[in-house]
Every structure is written in C-alpha cells, then in structure tokens.
C-alpha cells in the first residue's frame, strides 16, 4: 500500500494500555486502538492521556491505527 492509501485523522489519547498501545478518541467520536510509529519510538517521544495526536489508518480495518504525530 502506498502512503496515499492511508487515512489520516486527528484525535485525543484517552487511555494508555500495555505494550505502547493507546485508546484514541477521534474527532468524529469513534474510539480506536493505536500503537506508536517507529520514528516516535526511536526518538523517545512521550505520549500521555490528553495529548492531541495524528493517527494513520488503513481503509481495511477502521478499528486500529498508528500514531504518527503528537501535537504540541
């Protein structure tokens, strides 16, 4: 899948789960499970409940995603 096939949405982290998985509430009200991307993991960027994030999702599974950016 190319980069353009992914859906990017913004949301707020609601809960931190084990193994760097987070519950994220999207702007449209849906809640998804999201893990952090490799670049965020590599640079030790901390993500806490309440942070605003950008999530990348595949059109095939709209219940899971990847956190690709943490807004300031």
Curated annotation (Swiss-Prot):
Summary of subunit composition and partner proteins: Component of the 30S ribosomal translation pre-initiation complex which assembles on the 30S ribosome in the order IF-2 and IF-3, IF-1 and N-formylmethionyl-tRNA(fMet); mRNA recruitment can occur at any time during PIC assembly.
Record's subcellular location: Cytoplasm
The family this protein is said to belong to: Belongs to the IF-1 family.
UniProt keyword list: Cytoplasm, Initiation factor, Protein biosynthesis, RNA-binding, rRNA-binding
NCBIfam families: infA (TIGR00008)
InterPro entries, per database record: NA-bd_OB-fold, RNA-binding_domain_S1_IF1, S1_domain, TIF_IF1
Gene label: infA
Keyword presence, Cytoplasm: yes
GO terms for MF: ribosome binding; rRNA binding; translation initiation factor activity
Role: One of the essential components for the initiation of protein synthesis. Stabilizes the binding of IF-2 and IF-3 on the 30S subunit to which N-formylmethionyl-tRNA(fMet) subsequently binds. Helps modulate mRNA selection, yielding the 30S pre-initiation complex (PIC). Upon addition of the 50S ribosomal subunit IF-1, IF-2 and IF-3 are released leaving the mature 70S translation initiation complex.
Protein name, as recorded: Translation initiation factor IF-1
Domain S1-like: 1-72
GO CC terms of this entry: cytosol
Record flagged with keyword Nucleotide-binding: no
SUPFAM superfamilies found in the cross-reference section: Nucleic acid-binding proteins (SSF50249)
HAMAP family membership: IF_1
UniProt cross-references to Gene3D superfamilies, sorted A to Z: Nucleic acid-binding proteins
């Amino acid at each position: 899948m190319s980069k353009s096939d992914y859906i990017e949405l913004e949301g707020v982290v609601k809960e931190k789960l084990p193994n760097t998985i987070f519950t994220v509430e999207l702007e449209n009200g849906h809640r998804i499970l999201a893990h952090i991307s490799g670049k965020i993991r590599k640079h030790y960027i901390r993500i806490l409940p309440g942070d605003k994030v950008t999530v990348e999702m595949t059109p095939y599974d709209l219940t899971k995603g990847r956190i690709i950016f943490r807004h300031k």
